[in-house]
Amino acid sequence: MEADEVSIREQNFHSQVREYTICFLLFAVLYIVSYFIITRYKRKADEQEDEDAIVNRISLFLSTFTLAVSAGAVLLLPFSIISNEILLSFPQNYYIQWLNGSLIHGLWNLASLFSNLCLFVLMPFAFFFLESEGFAGLKKGIRARILETLVMLILLALLILGIVWVASALIDNDAASMESLYDLWEFYLPYLYSCISLMGCLLLLLCTPVGLSRMFTVMGQLLVKPTILEDLDEQMYIITLEEEAIQRKLNGISSTLENQTVELERELEKVKCKKTNLERRKKASAWERNLVYPAVMILLLIETSISVLLVAFNILYLLVDETAMPKGSGGPGIGNASLSTFGFVGAALEIILIFYLMVSSVVGFYSLRFFENFIPRKDDTTMTKIIGNCVSILVLSSALPVMSRTLGITRFDLLGDFGRFNWLGNFYIVLSYNLLFAIMTTLCLVRKFTSAVREELLKALGLDKLHLSNNPRDSETKPSANGHQKTL
């Protein structure tokens, strides 16, 4: 008996060591990839003092950690879905014994823990540390900046906890719930993270439909469009003449007229960009022009249509079946049954749709006017803007598993703290979320595909000069002689 107990303890010990090793290796890979992504966009700093260089380096490491956690949260649900199918297909395979329910539950718990840590501690610390200068009267240095940062963090924590305490007390006036608020770890922080998750899902609800319609424009800019009834040689000739004319103007302007020089340089950059695109289209092969672009557009349309159909079916399931709710539906467990009707093919389709929704949400996020200034630029993004981008991506990625389960994209149950959010058990919130997503996505797609017809109707009616087009982003501005902007 003692030998058996020792053997069981050894197996548990080796299993835990193996899980920690796998988690560490996965996170190390994500951290390295995140570091290269951030350094690609981070502004190359000029010669700085040692103190500022250390502060920037610490903020960079914290931002990289947050971006790695965001990537882990995005991969969480796809990894769990594919792991469930692998365990069903090869239940006794020796080489996949490391892949088990304990590992997957541990990954979900770590993702939840690190998301809370980054959102409430690391990112506020990085921002305040970057902006701090030290209190007046204290000796300047790293210690003074750390002290100021810690004080700001304590004040921020008191403010946020006080707001959540008042909000929860107003929502639920029960005495028992008031007393439970004093239990910080068991109630307060999960309640706060539940609110953040709800905000993230609402942000996804706003960004994803916009991104789904915007994806067609983005892919159209990245791919080479078919040259139907277009003479690229003539366009190249015209662009070359424009470039030469602007270059002659720049050479003839004196150095004292700085405003005109700056405007002409901007026009020259735009012309060069158009010329580069035309050269790329001219060099593209026939199959790239005539096959790749239509195939990608059709693929995007199919993925978007499947997403909307799945949401529509999920609405019907919610009305007739209580197990369709994202909270409280006890699943069969990992490796016990397939959660997709079509088995491995259905699981692969779910994973593709989850990644597609995440990419669309990011595209939609940066397409919103309020977040346009957040768009990172290569080698020209400040550290403050990088922190803002990391926080935004973290909120979106942390809410992605919740949104995917709420919309019925997958039937995989949310594990860890992701499945304990109170609002997931509210039928009216979940149903309203599905209805709003389906309606907003449909409206955005209809608006996208009917914009060309609408513009032609406005031109035919002579109303195109009234600027009724609802796509001001695509219009170009040109300065007039009196300094005002004219829309072309």
UniProtKB/Swiss-Prot annotation:
Role played: Putative membrane receptor.
Subcellular localization, as worded in the UniProt entry: Membrane
Tissue specificity comment: Detected ubiquitously at low levels throughout the developing embryo. Present initially in the limb mesoderm as the limb bud emerges from the body wall and up-regulated along the posterior margin of the developing limb bud with progression of the limb outgrowth. Higher levels are detected in limb buds, otic vesicles and pharyngeal arches. Isoform 1 is detected in lung, spleen, heart, breast muscle, cartilage and liver of the adult tissues. Isoform 3 is detected in adult lung, spleen, heart and breast muscle but not detected in cartilage and liver.
GO biological process, one term: signal transduction
Single Gene Ontology MF annotation: transmembrane signaling receptor activity
UniProt membrane topology term: Multi-pass membrane protein
Family stated for the protein in its record: Belongs to the LIMR family.
Source organism per UniProt: Gallus gallus
A Gene Ontology cellular-component term: plasma membrane
Recorded consequence of changing residue 266 to Q: In Lmbr1-N; associated with preaxial polydactyly
Keywords: Coiled coil, Membrane, Receptor, Transmembrane, Transmembrane helix
One Pfam family it belongs to: LMBR1
Lineage top rank: taxon: Eukaryota
Protein name: Limb region 1 protein homolog
Coiled-coil residue windows: 246-286
Transmembrane regions: 19-39, 62-82, 110-130, 151-171, 187-207, 296-316, 339-359, 383-403, 426-446
Spans within the Extracellular topological domain: 1-18, 83-109, 172-186, 317-338, 404-425
InterPro entries linked to this entry: LIMR, LMBR1-like_membr_prot
Ranges of the Cytoplasmic topological domain: 40-61, 131-150, 208-295, 360-382, 447-488
Main location (coarse class): membrane
